[in-house]
């Protein structure tokens, strides 16, 4: 390599696929069918629950953050959990307890798959007892810059609009090359529970 040449280094993960598991069956189970990927890919996923207790962390996965709320009074508890896994590359089914015995076509779970990620940074759950069309994600102190930040909403409330610089994929949002995240508002597909999770990856 001459003194005039430079080595190009990818500093942040690259989004390679997105998957949305969009149903919960009569037993209250929601599952995401994750296709085969490359070994070492990072999968960030969430599972929602119609109780005050977030779904247990599935075997082989690690928990990042949880969020809970009770937006409509007694019996209206909602919760969500964000998890991650550095995969061996094989196809798999990720299953969460949906906390309800009623079948639904609402998206109870979903995931984003990244290639080139090395670590999980800080994560936070967003809890609110209010309802509305806006999910407010608070400030996240980024430990290593630049980073990719991922936001998930709650079941039935896909993200339809995000701050400038964010990309929306199947109702989930992410932003690359961030040096700071001072918080912001995300528009939801319905006026419902304002709940979600956010995480930094690099």
Feature locations, PLM:
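Bacterial N-terminal signal peptides that target proteins for export
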Residues: 1-5
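Primarily extracytoplasmic/secreted proteins
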Residues: 6-202
């Amino acid at each position: 390599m001459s003194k005039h040449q430079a080595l190009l280094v990818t500093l942040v993960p690259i989004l390679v696929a997105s998957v949305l598991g969009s149903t919960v069956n009569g037993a209250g189970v929601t599952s995401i069918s994750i296709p085969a990927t490359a070994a070492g890919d990072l999968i960030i996923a969430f599972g929602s629950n119609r109780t005050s207790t977030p779904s247990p962390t599935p075997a082989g996965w690690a928990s990042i953050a949880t969020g809970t709320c009770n937006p409509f009074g007694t019996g209206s508890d909602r919760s969500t959990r964000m998890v991650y896994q550095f995969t061996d590359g094989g196809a798999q089914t990720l299953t969460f307890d949906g906390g309800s015995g009623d079948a639904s076509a609402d998206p109870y779970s979903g995931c984003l798959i990244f290639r080139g990620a090395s670590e999980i940074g800080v994560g936070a759950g967003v809890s609110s007892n209010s309802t509305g069309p806006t999910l407010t994600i608070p400030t996240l102190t980024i430990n290593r810059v630049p980073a990719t930040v991922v936001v998930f909403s709650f079941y039935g409330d896909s993200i339809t609009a995000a701050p400038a610089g964010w990309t929306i994929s199947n109702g989930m949002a992410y932003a690359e090359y961030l040096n700071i995240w001072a918080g912001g508002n995300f528009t939801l597909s319905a006026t419902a529970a304002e709940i979600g999770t956010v995480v930094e990856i690099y």
